Amino acid sequence: MQPGKYDVVVIGSGIGGLGAGALLAKRGYRTLMVEQTSRIGGRCATEEYQGFKLPTGAVALHKGLGITETYQEVGAEFDITMVPRLFYRIGGKDYEMPSKGSLTMLLEIVNKMEVDRTKLVGGLIKAAAGEKIMGAFRKSIAEPEKQTMTFRDWLLQYTDNEVAHDIFDTICATIECGHSYEIPAAAVFPWFTKMGGLREVGLTPHGNGFEMEKLAKVIRTNGDVWTDCPATKIVVEKGKASGVLVRKGDSETKVSSQVVISNAGPRKTVELAGANNFSEDYMRIMRLRLRPHPVVLAFVASDRPLWPEDGSAAIMMLAGTRRVTSIIPMSSIAPECAPPGQHVLFAYASPKSYCVRMNEEEELRQTELDLRELLPGLNKYGRILKMEPRNIDHDDTATNAWFGMPIETPVKNLYNVGDAMLPLGVVGATGAIDSGRRAAEIVRKGFKPGA
C-alpha cells in the first residue's frame, strides 16, 4: 500500500474511535487515527492535576457490554476494579442497596418514610404505591415504545410522592443526562433492561487513559496514531469519502483511504465534509437529536476519606439535593489516582435543566453548597480540588443519551461513532464503544483490507 494511503482513517481518539480502529487494525485493515490534542482517549483520557490523576469525563466504566469484549478481541487486557457496593442517600440517611432488587428496596424505603411521617402528623396513612409502581414498571420495560410522555409524567400516574420522584430524577439525571421532567419515558426503560442498573461498574486502577493507550497500541501494530494532528477536511468525491486532509506540524497532508470513521461528533463531521454533502432530512434529524448537555464535574481532595469514612469502595446516589446526584470516592477504589497520603472524591452535579445553557456561576455556587453539606469533613480535612462547568458549547460536552444518531451518513464510506450514536438504553462510554463495534462490523462486511 502506498505511503499516505490507508484502508481506514479514524478522526478523534475517543473510546468509540479507538474501539473501531483497534478492531479493524486487528482484522488486517491498515488504520490511521488522527487526534487534534496531545492526549489519547477523549472523555476517557486521564489528566494529571496537582499530583492527582483525574478523568477527563467518564469516571466509572461498565464491565462487559462491549468494552471487555473489544479488549478481548484485539488481544489486550482491560484492567478494572469493580465497585460492589451501592448506596442511596435519602432524607439524610445512607441506605445500602442489595445486589438485586434495588428499585423494590428504594420504593419500600419511600413507603416506610411516608407511613412514619403520616403517623407523626396524624391522618390517613398513604404509602407510595410501591407494588403498583413496580407492576407498571415491568409492563413498561416490556413495551417502552408505547410510552410517549416524560418519565415524570409516567410516574405521576402512580404516585405524587416527592421522595419517589426525587429518586427517579437522580437516576435519570446521573445516567441518562436529563431530568425526569425532560427525558422521554421511552428512553429510560430500556436502560434498566440493557445496562442492569448501576451494579456492574468499576474504575480503572491506573486511570482510563492507561487503558485507552492499550487500544492505540493495537492500532499502531497495523497503522499509525498521530496526535496534535487535527483533521481539517474530509475529502468527498462524487458523494463518497475518499480520505482526509490533516494538519501535521506546519503543513497539511492528504491521506487517502477506503473508509473514514469520525469520532469528532456529527456536527463536526458535517463541517469537515461540507454541509452540501448531507441531505436536509439528515440535518433535521441531527438538529432534533443532537443536544449537548451542560454539567458540572467536581473533585474533592482530602487528608482522609470523606465518604465512606472507613475508606471502603462504594458509589453513592443522592436524592433531593440541590445539584450533586452522585459521589464516587475514586481513591478508595483506585488508590493510584491520588498522591500518597491523599484521597480524591468525584461528584457529579446536575444543573436545573439539561436542555439549555446553564448559568455557570450559579451552578458552581449550588454545587459547592451541596458538597459542604453532604461531606461534613470537607472543611476540616479536605479542599475542593477542581470544579469544572461544561456548558453546551464546551469542547468536551457530551450529548444526551436519549435517542442516538445513525452511524451511517448520506456520504458513502463515511461513518460516525461516539456518544451521539448511542443505541437506545445504552449510555456513556459503553454506548460509544458499541458504536465503534457496529462501525467496524460494517467495514468488515463491505470492504477488503488493501483493496
Question: What residue ranges belong to the model's regions?
Answer:
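N-terminal Rossmann-like FAD-binding beta1-loop-alpha1 element of flavoenzymes
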Residues: 6-33
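Conserved flavin/dinucleotide-binding core of flavoenzymes
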Residues: 327-451
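Helical element adjacent to the flavin cofactor pocket in flavoenzyme catalytic cores
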Residues: 191-249
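Rossmann-like flavin
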Residues: 93-94, 107-189
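Glycine-rich FAD pyrophosphate-binding loop
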Residues: 26-49
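Mid-domain catalytic core of redox enzymes
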Residues: 232-342
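Dinucleotide-binding Rossmann-like beta1-alpha1 core, especially the glycine-rich loop
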Residues: 50-125
